[in-house]
Structures are given as C-alpha cells and as structure tokens.
C-alpha cells in the first residue's frame, strides 16, 4: 500500500490517476483475495488458463488482451444466444480481473477521503462503523421533527449508467474500457439466469466489486442533497467535506433546472430549513424535517425529477413515502420507530388561585417488529410460521456444547442488536423460541423427549441465553434493583454492533 500511495502522490499524477498499470501487479490480486503478499494466488490449473502459469503478471496481461480480442467478436447485441464472448473461460477471466480492479480503483478515493478527514480533524471511519450510532442520532433529533420521508434508492437499470457514473470519477480511459468489458462479460454470462443489466450480478461472486459499484451509484443519488444544501448559504459546509469532488455536475444539473423551474435560484428558499436531517443505510434512507408537509413534498418532487433526469430512468414516486412522526411509525434497520406524545398535568397554585398546566413531552419510541423476526426464524427453521419452536437440523459431528454455543451466539446477537427497544416483550418471545428450539434440537439428537431432556439437565439449562445481558446491565446500573426489572424499561444501545449475522450461517 505504501508503494501505491507513493506512486499516486507523485507530482505528475496528482491531478489524474493512471490506475491501469496496477492491474498487472500480482500483489493487487493478493490484496483482493486477502492472501499473503509473498504467495501467488493466480496459479490455476493449465486446463483453466490455457497457458503457462509461471508468471502471474504475464497471466493477467494475457487475460486482458484476450478480453479485448474476444469483445470484437460479439455478433449481435440483440440476440441473447449469440451475444457471447468467444472462449470457454471468460467468466473466470473477467471475475479475476474485476477483483483486482476493485482494489485498484479504491486507492485514490481512499487517499482523498483520508486526507480530507485529516485536514478537518474528523475521527477515522472505523470509529463510525456502528449502525447503532444512527439510533442515538434519531433519539436526539427526531423528537423535534414533524415529518419523515421513507426513501428507497432506485437501482440502475443499465450497466452503461454505472460506467458513465464512474467516468466522472476516473479519468483513466483504459481502466474505463476494461470496466465496461468486465461489466458486459458478467451481463452476458448471467443473462439467462438473472435480470439483465442489474447490479445484483456481482453481489455473490465478487462482493468487493459489487460494493464499490453500489457505493458509487448511491453517492450519485445522494449528491443532490449536497448541492442543494450548499447553495442557499453560499458556503462550503463542513458536514459534506468528506465527499469527493465531482466534475461536470453543473452541466448535468442544467437540464434538471429547466424541468423544475425556469429560475432555479427562486426555489432555493425551500431548502433553507436548518432542521432537515438525512440518514441512509444500504439502499434505504430517511429524510426528516421540522417544517411543514409542503417542504417535504417539494423535496420528494425534486428527488424524483433529479433521478429521472440524471439516470435516465423512471423513478416511481411511490418509492418515497411521507409520514407524520406522531401518527405513523417508519421501519428502519429492524425497528419500528416513531415519536410519541406523553402528556402530563401539573397543578400549580398562586395565592388563592390554582390552575392546571397540560404539557406534552415528545419521546422517541423504538419497537421490535415481531412478525418479521418470526419470519426470519421460520426461514432459518428455528420455528414455524406461527412462531412455534421446532428442532433445527444439525450436522451429526456437532457436539452438544457446539450446538449450545451456536444457539447462544444467535440469541446474544439478537438481544444486543434489539436492546434499544422501548418494549422488550417481543425480544423475550424471540429468546423463548430460540431456547425451546435448542432444547428440541438436543433432545432430537439424543432421541429423547423434550420433557425428559429438560428434567435431566435441570433448571440451569441454557442460562447463558439470559445471563449476559443482565451482567452487562449490572455494570451499567450498579444499584440494588434487579437488572431484569431494569432491562424491561431501560433502553441500551450496544454501539459495538456492526451487523446482525445471518441466522442460517450459524447452524
């Protein structure tokens, strides 16, 4: 990485990065696969590569050359049966090169982001990874807001849109051509089993490449927020300082201005709301405002028009739902969130006169949706669709302690993630399902009934399903009151949680 940084920081390459030469370096592909740099990962059988595998750099060069030559042999774009690259191993070639390309193309953006954070003395990104850091933000901000807009970010409908998006970021023409060849090779090899021109083609086989394409597309979708928030105040907001510079954006926004209004400056007053907040996780985002419903409707209209003009796609207005926080909860990150009004009456007396004061206190509420969680558990075969626990299929070589540890890990992950819920009844029901499912699984393994199995183990069976949270609460609240009673009404955000592990992957 130091060699890459030294190359990119040379005077001749500060303005324009030439990434193509890095694709011929073996350590790039070692980084892509997480292997040691002193070990080659490109040594494949001769029948797979059709050439000598002694020089990995030469292998990559030949693969790229072969991709260029085969792309000229496309017969017809419209004929799906003939629209194939000639050759029997092109899918492996493009997959391997795209993995290296994903590593190379991240380098300049990472350097820019790190330098931007250092200049503004912003904490490193690994300190901000927790998705649970969103909920304290909600708890602090949403109680003062009125409306929320639930947004689903549109997906790109054509691969060329992704190429054009990256064209404004990467000025290296050979790299862009190689990217286009790799994208269409994936499209051709998957067109019979997956929807055409979909970004989901890369989600399973090359997750790093998929994440880079997905993040670049999401950045384009979100850039209108940066543009509109900067314009009213004629300042470069520090809140958006970590975003990368763009080229030709004002040329792209020109058509949007014509569509929205002949005089764009007259509409900028709509975006001067200082209480506008935007939060996104993956493909779903939340836009909340303290202003009137008209303001949030204007934002919805501008977003739909921007996506249609910028990405040449029909963005359905139904993908953006406007809700009032007091009456309609919104689903985000596994929680049903809303703002509840708690009224309280205070009696006051001054001399001979007494009067009552009615006050309403806004409180941010988070509820665990029990139906989606039971659906996930049923899909993973911990229970049926009605929530009745069933025995989980297991491998014959697993011991009782391994099965118990895996069930306990799932329960702890769910308990920690949903510990911020205002009401814990749903969480206790999930624990009950996992506990009985584990008991049924072990009794099935020992060919015994669940009643006899539990009687033999005693009341201490599966204590770790419930003890860890109580121990954590006893450290946070070192009082004489029972932790179990406090856990029922206290809301704890475990900020070390980054994601929920897939339930199916544990057993």
Curated annotation (Swiss-Prot):
GO MF annotation list: RNA binding
An individual GO BP term: tRNA processing
Record localization: Plastid, Chloroplast
Domain of life, per lineage: Eukaryota
GO terms for cellular component: chloroplast
Keyword GTP-binding annotated: no
Pfam families (alphabetical): Intron_maturas2, MatK_N
InterPro entries: Domain_X (IPR024937), Maturase_MatK (IPR002866), Maturase_MatK_N (IPR024942)
Entry keyword Cell division: no
Keyword list, A-Z: Chloroplast, mRNA processing, Plastid, RNA-binding, tRNA processing
Family: Belongs to the intron maturase 2 family. MatK subfamily.
Chain's role: Usually encoded in the trnK tRNA gene intron. Probably assists in splicing its own and other chloroplast group II introns.
Protein name listed in UniProt: Maturase K
Species in which this protein is naturally found: Umbellularia californica
Gene: matK
């Amino acid at each position: 990485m130091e060699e890459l940084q030294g190359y990119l920081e040379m005077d001749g390459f500060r303005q324009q990065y030439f990434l193509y030469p890095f694709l011929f370096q073996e350590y790039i592909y070692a980084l892509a696969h997480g292997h040691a740099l002193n070990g080659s990962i490109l040594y494949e059988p001769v029948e797979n590569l059709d050439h000598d595998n002694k020089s990995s750099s030469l292998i990559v060069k030949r693969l790229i050359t072969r991709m260029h030559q085969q792309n000229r042999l496309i017969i017809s774009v419209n004929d799906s049966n003939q629209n194939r690259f000639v050759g029997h191993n092109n899918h492996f070639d493009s997959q391997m090169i795209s993995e290296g390309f994903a590593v190379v193309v991240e380098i300049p953006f990472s350097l820019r982001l790190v330098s931007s954070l250092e200049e503004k003395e912003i904490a490193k990104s690994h300190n901000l990874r927790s998705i649970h850091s969103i909920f304290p933000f909600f708890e602090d901000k949403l109680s003062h807001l009125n409306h929320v807009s639930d947004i689903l970010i549109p997906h790109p409908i054509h691969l060329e849109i992704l190429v054009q998006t990256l064209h404004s970021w990467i000025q290296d023409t050979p790299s862009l051509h190689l990217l286009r060849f790799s994208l269409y090779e994936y499209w051709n090899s998957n067109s019979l089993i997956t929807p055409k021109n979909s970004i989901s083609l890369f989600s399973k086989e090359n997750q790093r490449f998929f994440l880079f394409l997905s993040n670049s597309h999401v950045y384009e979708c979100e850039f209108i927020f940066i543009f509109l928030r900067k314009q009213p105040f004629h300042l470069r907001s520090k809140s958006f300082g970590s975003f990368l510079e763009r080229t030709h954006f004002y040329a792209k926004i020109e058509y949007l201005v014509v569509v929205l209004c002949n005089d764009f400056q007259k509409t900028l007053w709509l975006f001067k709301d200082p209480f506008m907040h935007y939060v996104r996780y993956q493909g779903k985002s939340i836009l909340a405002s303290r202003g009137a419903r008209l303001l949030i409707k204007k934002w919805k209209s501008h977003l739909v028009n921007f996506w249609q003009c910028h990405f040449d796609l029909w963005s359905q207005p139904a993908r953006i739902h406007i809700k009032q926080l007091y009456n309609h909860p919104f689903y985000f990150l596994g929680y049903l969130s809303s703002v509840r009004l708690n009224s309280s009456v205070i009696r006051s007396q001054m001399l001979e006169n007494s009067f009552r004061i009615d006050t309403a206190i806004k409180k941010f509420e988070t509820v665990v949706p029990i139906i989606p969680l039971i659906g996930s558990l049923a899909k993973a075969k911990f229970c049926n669709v009605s929530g009745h626990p069933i025995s989980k299929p297991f491998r014959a070589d697993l011991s009782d302690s391994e099965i118990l540890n895996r069930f306990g890990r799932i329960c702890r992950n769910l308990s920690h993630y949903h510990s911020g819920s205002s009401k814990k009844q749903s969480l206790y029901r999930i624990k009950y399902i996992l506990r009985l499912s584990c008991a049924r699984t072990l009794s099935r393994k020992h060919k015994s009934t669940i009643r006899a199995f539990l009687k033999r183990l005693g009341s201490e069976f599966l204590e770790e399903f419930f003890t860890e949270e109580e121990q954590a609460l006893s450290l946070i609240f070192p009082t004489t009151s029972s932790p179990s009673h406090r856990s029922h009404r206290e809301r704890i955000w475990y900020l070390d949680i980054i994601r929920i592990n897939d339930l199916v992957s544990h057993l």
